[in-house]
Structure formats: C-alpha cells, structure tokens
C-alpha cells in the first residue's frame, strides 16, 4: 500500500471511529429484506458492511426475511402465494417451504457471505422465539406472534464476537412452528437484548409526506409525532406496523431507530456515519 493510500485509509478510519463511538461494544439489530436482499451485488455490500462494523467493535444482530424465495417455493408446489392485509397466509405446505427456504437456503447463503463470522440461527433454536398463533379476524394459518424472546444463544454468539443471522420462525409450547413478521422479530429481539439501535432496510426512501414523491422524505420523526402523522394519513398501510416496531423499541429504552433505503449501496454505513438515508425515529 502506497504512503498516500495509507494516509487516506487512516483518515477514513479515524472518521469512522468518531461516528461509531456511541455504538462500540453496543448492539445494533438490523432487519434485512427487500431489494437489498434480492440484488446479489447489494447483498454482498450489505454483508461487507456488517463485517466491517463487527471488526470495528459493533455487535450486530441480523434478522432477515425471504419473501420472494418463499413465494417461489410455494409456486413450485403448484400453489399461488396468498396475502391478506400484507401478511402471508401460511398453510401447512407454506410453513414447510418457510422452514426449507427461510431457515435453510436463505439463512445459510447469508452466513456464507460473512466469512466465518456469521452463525445461522432460527427462532426455533433453544426456543429463542416463543410464540403463539396470531389471533386476528382472519385465520392466517401458521402465523405467530411473539410471547417471549430467549436471548441465551444470541448472547453466547455476541460474546464470541460472532454475528447472529436469524430467520424469523418461532415455536409454540407444543412444538408447532410459525412464520413471524420480520420487523416484529427485529424489534422484539432489539428490546430483549437492550440494543442501542434498530435499523430496518426497505425498498423505499423512508417515510414520505407524499408516497409518490421521494423528494418529500421526512428525515426525522420524534415518536410523539407518530400518531399525528397517522391521523394525517402520512403514515399508512404497511408503514403503520413497521413504524410501530420502531416506536415500541424506542419507548422501551432504545436510543433510536432508522428506516433506511436498502437500494442505496452501503445504506447501513451511511446512516451510522451521519449521512442522509431514510427516516430516523427518536425520543426527546
């Protein structure tokens, strides 16, 4: 490495250390999904960024979805994926696909990209995600809601400087497996671990005043403003439960939560290093 390259690298490292100081030896939970997971180039960049954070002393927990792969697996069975109010209807065939694709193929492909630092976990392991069947007006099948998060495996992995990579399947007290919403899992795990920050990667720029115009991005929201934004119709549809996960985390003692644009290369680093990406939720 040439002298000027060494100097540039040193300067960058010093700047990164300043921005990361509040998070060193602290836990950040990242919910990973959307286009950043489908696009192979973006996927590699995300894993590289998470590895870098790990090397710089940040304890990262990665919670991932896998919707497209699950839908593809269901179609291979000759069935059409079904959704109601944004939630996947999960019959017996579908939960089998979830276990094979989400907890299997998708999880292990991410672990492989973490080059020996990732450890693949499923919410069924050691009853990490204890859940019960989701009670709703509609019967979603094997869709669960979390009753308790057991953090023992996560704490063991983090203490060994490993990166837990978690697929969002839980189990009830009868040993029945359930599919669980990834944003909910990330928020519940962040609260259970006392994480400093929750990051949710999406396929949109963040919270928009006009959902058809990305120039109307709202960069910051104080949690007390959320209900007013719902009343105005600015927070609507699938953003309501996503933002509820952020506010639940902050109200439980988390420092801040970000909904970031996963289509942007190095989106996680940009948000941590003080750049403009997505919407930051915080409490005064």
UniProtKB/Swiss-Prot annotation:
<dbReference type="InterPro" id="IPR041727">
    <property type="entry name" value="NAGK-C"/>
</dbReference>
<feature type="binding site">
    <location>
        <position position="179"/>
    </location>
    <ligand>
        <name>substrate</name>
    </ligand>
</feature>
<dbReference type="Pfam" id="PF00696">
    <property type="entry name" value="AA_kinase"/>
</dbReference>
<dbReference type="InterPro" id="IPR036393">
    <property type="entry name" value="AceGlu_kinase-like_sf"/>
</dbReference>
<keyword id="KW-0028">Amino-acid biosynthesis</keyword>
<keyword id="KW-0963">Cytoplasm</keyword>
<dbReference type="InterPro" id="IPR001057">
    <property type="entry name" value="Glu/AcGlu_kinase"/>
</dbReference>
<comment type="pathway">
    <text>Amino-acid biosynthesis; L-arginine biosynthesis; N(2)-acetyl-L-ornithine from L-glutamate: step 2/4.</text>
</comment>
<comment type="similarity">
    <text>Belongs to the acetylglutamate kinase family. ArgB subfamily.</text>
</comment>
<feature type="binding site">
    <location>
        <position position="88"/>
    </location>
    <ligand>
        <name>substrate</name>
    </ligand>
</feature>
<dbReference type="InterPro" id="IPR004662">
    <property type="entry name" value="AcgluKinase_fam"/>
</dbReference>
<dbReference type="InterPro" id="IPR001048">
    <property type="entry name" value="Asp/Glu/Uridylate_kinase"/>
</dbReference>
<protein>
    <recommendedName>
        <fullName>Acetylglutamate kinase</fullName>
        <ecNumber>2.7.2.8</ecNumber>
    </recommendedName>
</protein>
<keyword id="KW-0067">ATP-binding</keyword>
<feature type="binding site">
    <location>
        <begin position="66"/>
        <end position="67"/>
    </location>
    <ligand>
        <name>substrate</name>
    </ligand>
</feature>
<dbReference type="GO" id="GO:0006526">
    <property type="term" value="P:L-arginine biosynthetic process"/>
</dbReference>
<keyword id="KW-0808">Transferase</keyword>
<dbReference type="GO" id="GO:0003991">
    <property type="term" value="F:acetylglutamate kinase activity"/>
</dbReference>
<dbReference type="GO" id="GO:0042450">
    <property type="term" value="P:arginine biosynthetic process via ornithine"/>
</dbReference>
<keyword id="KW-0547">Nucleotide-binding</keyword>
<keyword id="KW-0418">Kinase</keyword>
<comment type="function">
    <text>Catalyzes the ATP-dependent phosphorylation of N-acetyl-L-glutamate.</text>
</comment>
<feature type="site" description="Transition state stabilizer">
    <location>
        <position position="242"/>
    </location>
</feature>
<dbReference type="GO" id="GO:0005737">
    <property type="term" value="C:cytoplasm"/>
</dbReference>
<keyword id="KW-0055">Arginine biosynthesis</keyword>
<dbReference type="GO" id="GO:0005524">
    <property type="term" value="F:ATP binding"/>
</dbReference>
<feature type="site" description="Transition state stabilizer">
    <location>
        <position position="31"/>
    </location>
</feature>
<dbReference type="InterPro" id="IPR037528">
    <property type="entry name" value="ArgB"/>
</dbReference>
């Amino acid at each position: 490495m040439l002298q000027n390259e060494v100097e540039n690298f040193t300067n960058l490292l010093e700047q990164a250390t300043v921005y990361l100081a509040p998070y060193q030896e602290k836990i950040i939970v990242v919910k990973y999904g959307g286009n950043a997971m489908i696009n192979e180039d973006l996927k590699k960049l995300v894993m590289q960024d998470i590895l870098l954070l790990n090397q710089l002393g940040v304890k990262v927990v990665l919670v991932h979805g896998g919707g497209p792969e699950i839908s593809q697996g269901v179609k291979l069975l000759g069935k059409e994926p079904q959704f109601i109010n944004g939630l996947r209807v999960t019959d017996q065939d579908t939960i089998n696909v979830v276990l094979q694709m989400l907890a299997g193929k998708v999880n292990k492909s991410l672990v492989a990209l973490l080059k020996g630092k990732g450890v693949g976990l499923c919410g069924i392991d050691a009853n990490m995600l204890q859940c019960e069947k989701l009670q709703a007006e509609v019967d979603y099948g094997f869709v669960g809601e979390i009753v308790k998060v057991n953090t023992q495996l996560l704490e063991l992995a983090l203490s060994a400087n490993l990166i837990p990579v978690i697929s969002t399947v839980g189990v009830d007290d009868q040993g029945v497996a359930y599919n669980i919403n990834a944003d909910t899992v990330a928020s519940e795990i962040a609260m259970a671990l006392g994480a400093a920050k929750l990051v949710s990667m999406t396929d949109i720029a963040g919270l928009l005043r006009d959902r058809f115009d990305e120039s109307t991005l709202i960069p910051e929201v104080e949690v007390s403003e959320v209900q007013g934004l719902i009343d105005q119709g600015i927070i609507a549809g699938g953003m309501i439960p996503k933002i509820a996960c952020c506010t639940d985390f902050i109200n439980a003692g988390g420092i801040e939560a970000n909904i970031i644009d996963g289509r942007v290369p190095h989106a996680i680093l940009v948000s941590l290093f003080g750049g403009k990406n997505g919407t930051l939720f915080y409490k005064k």
